[in-house]
Design a protein with these regions (language model features):
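Conserved "landmark" site that anchors the functional core of diverse proteins
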Residues: 1-295
Length: 295
């Protein structure tokens, strides 16, 4: 039997639902904390803040809480208490972004362990490549890197050491070719260019010292869907790093390739898939999805 108040989802999801929208779908109800796609039936809006990354806990509503929606003619005025002074770590300007390419994000190992808040781990899409870039320049494996799609061009403001890993792409220091997964000294005034990838999609740029970016829920990873983390990198941004680095550089690393090119010129890759969190919603035809070779 259908519970009272239950409504089916929209046959066509909306591409953008406004923040604060109150929606129901099936036996569930929710408030959209940020602008995001969604296919729930919308009842109205609320200005009650549902999320504050600086609060403990960040989510206003916790499992087991009872929530009542009340119709009002006018939303009350609220005082924003979410702003808190945050002391940014010391940073040294190292590189200026001359061209950010199609998309460049700050990424690290993400936000594991907060799935109960509805927050996905996010982080670098190719963690092996990100870790390799960091180790090559003497950073901790999980230090923040730049994750780039479509090429990037950087101008050194001071002498620094960088490493590029990931997809197969041409990397140049000025006009000199540079190998992937090799630490490279870039002197002040010189530029590093990474062309769009020819095999694969994402390249990773690590800078010795570790890139500094705004942290949210313990991570500087940019999650473009939820809006968590720093904004995407844009042309003109200045990339800063920690003032000290004690690790040794490593020029003996291999670039980890997630995608390989076969003799017929096609690329092949194996994608890891985890069903869930509501894997009980899948029917028997899920096996067709898992067993199909996609092209």
């Amino acid at each position: 039997p259908t519970r009272r108040g239950a409504r089916p989802r929209c046959s066509r999801p909306r591409t953008a639902v406004p923040a604060g929208a109150v929606g129901i779908a099936g036996e569930f109800s929710a408030v959209y904390p940020r602008v995001s796609p969604g296919g729930w039936q919308l009842l109205g809006t609320t200005n009650t803040p549902m999320w504050d990354s600086n609060a403990n806990p960040p989510a206003l509503v916790q499992p087991g809480d009872r929530v009542r929606y009340r119709s009002v003619d006018k939303l009350p005025e609220l005082v924003d208490h979410s702003a808190r002074s945050k002391r940014a770590p010391a940073r040294l300007p190292r590189m200026e972004v001359i061209d950010a390419g199609l998309l460049t994000l700050y990424q690290d190992l993400g936000r594991p362990g907060v799935g109960d808040l509805g927050v996905t781990p996010s982080g670098a899409a190719d963690r092996a490549a990100a870790a390799t870039a960091n180790v090559a320049v003497g950073n901790p494996r999980g230090a923040t890197v730049l994750e780039n799609i479509g090429g990037i061009k950087l101008h050194a403001l001071t002498d620094t050491v960088i490493c590029v890993t990931g997809a197969t792409a041409r990397v140049r220091l000025g006009e000199m070719p540079v190998h992937l997964a090799r630490p490279v000294l870039v002197t002040a005034g010189h530029t590093v260019s990474v062309d769009p990838a020819t095999v694969g999609m994402r390249n990773y740029v690590a800078i010795r010292g570790g890139i500094i970016a705004e942290s949210e829920l313990g991570s500087a990873a940019t999650d473009v869907l939820s809006g968590l983390g720093p904004d995407p990198v844009t042309t003109g941004d200045v990339i800063g790093v920690l003032p000290r680095s004690t690790g040794m550089t490593d020029a003996q690393l291999a670039n980890p390739l997630r995608v390989s090119e076969s003799s017929d010129g096609k690329t092949r890759a194996t994608l890891r898939c985890v069903l869930g969190p509501r894997d009980d919603w899948f029917g028997d035809n899920v096996s067709a999805f898992l067993d199909t070779e996609w092209t």
